[in-house]
Amino acid sequence: MQKPDFMYLKNLTVPIVLLDTYCDFPNVDCVMINNMQGAFNATVRLIHKHIGQPGYLHSSYPIHSFEERCEGFYRALRKNGLPSSKSVVHLLSPSVEGAYADMLELLEQNTPLASCYFADNDNIAIGAMKAFQHKGYKIPADISIIGFDNMPLSTSVIPALSTIHVPKQNLGKTAAERLINVIESDEYYSVKIEISATYIAVSYTHLRAHETLRHL
């Protein structure tokens, strides 16, 4: 959702809890993933593993959660003394098919590449990965990628994708509990709740099964 989409919420008098979306209206509660922290941790992991400047597979479509992940990426660079201007950034559509087409076009233009990337979501990561593989790059031997969201597709691609896990059940449970609390309470105060995301690495068993794979 974008800012204009929220306007119809402004004058509603019923309890409102948004899930994984931020809105600054005083009558709206939000339960969100800590996107900034998840992206920060993923980027720091890439920096420490690859001892270099990670690239960024950034969504070409503006979404608030992606902008928070963008801030986490650049904050990790600054924290580790790396210049933001030297990171390779590719703007890709936030779908597997769109990211694949966009990345393939960039590769055909001989666009400079990084040795590792953080991606705004798993769809972008997987689409880019397929484009790299189409052009003969080995994943992760030549290029490593960490996605975000831990979508089911991340474990079915070869090689499997390391990603940031979003605890969807906990997210929904927290939102439902907050909504019930608002309904039953006599007084109201707006809250914005953030839930931590965690890193999910490719398992050792999977590494043994696929010789091209190495742990990020």
Briefly describe each language-model feature range.
Residues 4, 30-41, 57-78, 82-104, ...:
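Hinge/beta->alpha junction and helix N-cap segments in small-molecule ligand-binding domains
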Residues 31, 105-207:
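Flexible loop/turn connectors
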Residues 52-53, 115:
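Short acidic/polar active-site loop segments enriched in Thr and Asp
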Residues 52, 83-84, 138, 213:
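Conserved H-loop
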Residues 1-44, 48, 107-108, 112:
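Alpha-helical recognition/docking segments in bacterial nutrient-uptake
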Residues 205-215:
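Conserved small/polar residues in nucleotide/adenosyl-binding loops
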